């Protein structure tokens, strides 16, 4: 038997293996993944429960992957066996890699969704509120599309005062992504200017998933997320759910539905305004009545504090003081009378006491006179006889009397006395 060198046997093995396993499909779990930053080549192992085989994915093929290769993924690789003669190693030179059970596009989309979710692209807290009464709306669509025609028709019926501006955009095929991104940036550039748009609507009618798949692109997602203007995604039909729907501030199932969601119904608002007017009139009448009652209350309060009222209160106080003085005067006279009655006749013979008695009598008459003046009515006069105040009931016909008040004095004679 011919003896072979190591190099010779490895060369023969290489020729045999590479010819026999020129194209193979192998399924297994990705492990030991290494991606070289400089070369861009990916090196990994594919394993099952019993064996492991090394694999290589060169940069050109790696760039065609629509998803990110990660440890632990169950993959089906398509390629050929290659042998490295110097070490006698063999590996699978991968041409294509597909996820097991799902397509590469689906996996790529799921990975992109997870990436954007972690960046907060889907968070409700980061979404802008829908404008209540839009005046100017940018519609990113094809100006010759049925979607644009439907949107204009619905807008004119619902809210004709809103200005719709079509930004003509390529909505499918090569160049679609870049065209949409540029249109979003253009519409958003008017933000905070007098020509600012209240909303940006990215709209396209239905089509195949291939036609709509551009709206799953990360660049469009970035443009929508970074826009400072409220955005809506209205792509395809109700059953179509794309990445742009998740990132935009609001999703509409169709372009027509976008107008129904975004624009208020003018007929409904006219009815509501009528209702508001009725409520406003009713509230105004109620408020007016309340204010009238309040003013009447204030007027009554002011009247109580008026000059006339104060004068009346002072008159009442004066009357009370007069009565109090009268009572004190009468009490004083009674005390003095009692004291005089207790003084004996013998004591009164004393010149000193007689003088005091006369003085006391004068004081008594003065007090009676003062007492009479206190009770004197507004148009009355004091009645006196022999310079002493007397009551009418003690007078008799023929008595000479004097009538006096603060302003005058008069003499009179009693003609008759009628006792009541």
UniProtKB/Swiss-Prot annotation:
GO terms for molecular function: exodeoxyribonuclease VII activity; nucleic acid binding. It catalyses: Exonucleolytic cleavage in either 5'- to 3'- or 3'- to 5'-direction to yield nucleoside 5'-phosphates. Its EC number is 3.1.11.6. Keywords: Cytoplasm, Exonuclease, Hydrolase, Nuclease. It is an enzyme of class 3 (hydrolase). It is found in: Cytoplasm. The keyword Cytoplasm applies. One of its GO terms (cellular component) is exodeoxyribonuclease VII complex. Its main location: cytoplasm. One of its GO terms (biological process) is DNA catabolic process. Pfam families: Exonuc_VII_L, tRNA_anti_2. Belongs to the XseA family. Bidirectionally degrades single-stranded DNA into large acid-insoluble oligonucleotides, which are then degraded further into small acid-soluble oligonucleotides. Heterooligomer composed of large and small subunits. This is Exodeoxyribonuclease 7 large subunit. The lineage of its organism: Bacteria, Pseudomonadati, Campylobacterota, Epsilonproteobacteria, Campylobacterales.
